[in-house]
């Protein structure tokens, strides 16, 4: 598919956003809080934007402030001439965005190595490309099987998640760009400890489990078919299990998608991110576990959130990059084989802004 564009500049470990400058109003502080949540919860961008831009009832106070008290009426005077209305600043045209979300069992020193583009002993356990179309009317999550056999730029062929081990976030980004023939604008890595903590900060998440199973590690948690309320540890067991299934990693990816959709639904519900305290708790809980590329600044987050203000809350479609089944590499590894024709079709849909048509044509509206 040709050479992929250079990935974003070197990554950096995330840190809590700086306090607003003196004199900043309550709305600015609220914006910073919600944009911090957007950083952590890239898959919930539509819900965050909804909360950010939802109109406040007339007469209500800004977040964190009280309604001003009435003051005694002054003596009648001639009203001043009205000031001329300011000329509105035109909104820049929106463009499609691709954000790579990585779930990794990384430690603090390994996250720093990944941010710097250094080799480490970590691999991405979950890879999801978040695609936000230019019209901002939906959000797509494309799961990539971690054992997919691909070209790693400069390193030959290997499992796709080896990009993180061999060259940190920059090489992982470049690898997915080469695979899909699509530029990735930003990359976010969340470790699994942060994933569990975020779930607990939300009060748990209700997930509709389609296939009953019992975990094969740790406490061997049982997940009956139907709606399960998952706390952090149970959620972690749910999204990481693969040995309990006949099709292994394929069902694990489906479970990851089900959890992400359930989390989006909770965030989009009334009260999910509407409470400032809830948002702050999410940010302070999860930010120590997040690594992002250096270009994912507060300004870029603000631009993204503003452009998403008309996105219907909770609109998300999750599916898996098509593959050609499983096989064995020359050195004996169990791998997932690429489906070149299907990957090319998806790449063309991403590049032409026709992903909605691709999803409809392949009946992926409810995932796969």
Predicted regions and their residues:
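Non-catalytic, solvent-exposed segments at the cell envelope interface
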Residues: 2-368
């Amino acid at each position: 598919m040709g050479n992929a564009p250079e990935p974003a500049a070197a990554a950096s470990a995330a840190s809590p956003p700086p306090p607003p400058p003196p004199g900043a109003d309550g709305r600015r502080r609220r914006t910073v809080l919600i944009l911090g949540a957007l950083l952590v919860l890239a898959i919930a961008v539509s819900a965050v934007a909804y909360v950010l831009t939802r109109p406040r009832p007339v007469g209500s106070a800004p977040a964190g402030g009280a309604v001003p008290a009435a003051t005694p009426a002054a003596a009648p005077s001639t009203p001043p001439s009205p000031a001329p209305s300011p000329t509105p600043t035109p909104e820049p045209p929106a463009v499609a965005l691709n954000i790579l979300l990585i779930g990794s069992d990384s430690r603090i020193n390994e996250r720093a190595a990944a941010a710097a583009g250094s080799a480490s002993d970590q691999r991405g356990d979950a890879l999801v490309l978040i695609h936000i179309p230019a019209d901002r009317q939906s959000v797509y999550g494309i799961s990539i099987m971690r054992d997919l056999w691909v070209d790693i730029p400069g390193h030959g062929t290997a499992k796709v998640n080896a990009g993180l081990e061999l060259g940190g976030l920059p090489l992982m980004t470049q690898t997915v760009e080469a695979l899909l023939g699509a530029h990735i604008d930003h990359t976010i890595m969340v470790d699994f400890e942060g994933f569990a903590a975020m779930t607990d900060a939300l009060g748990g998440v209700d997930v509709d489990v389609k296939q009953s199973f019992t975990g094969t590690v740790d406490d061997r948690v049982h997940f009956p078919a139907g709606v399960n309320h998952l706390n952090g540890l149970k959620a972690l067991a749910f999204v990481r299990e693969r040995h309990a299934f006949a099709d292994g990693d394929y069902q694990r990816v489906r479970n990851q998608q089900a959890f992400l959709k359930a989390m989006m639904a909770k965030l989009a519900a009334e009260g999910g991110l509407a409470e400032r305290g809830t948002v702050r708790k999410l940010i302070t809980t999860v930010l120590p576990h997040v690594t992002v590329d250096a270009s994912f600044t507060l300004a870029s987050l603000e631009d993204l959130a503003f452009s998403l203000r008309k996105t219907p809350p909770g609109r998300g479609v999750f599916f898996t990059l098509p593959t050609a089944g499983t096989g064995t590499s020359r050195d004996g590894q169990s791998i997932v084989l690429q489906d070149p024709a299907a990957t090319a079709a998806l790449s063309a849909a991403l590049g032409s802004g026709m992903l909605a048509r691709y999803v409809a044509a392949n009946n992926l509206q409810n995932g796969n």
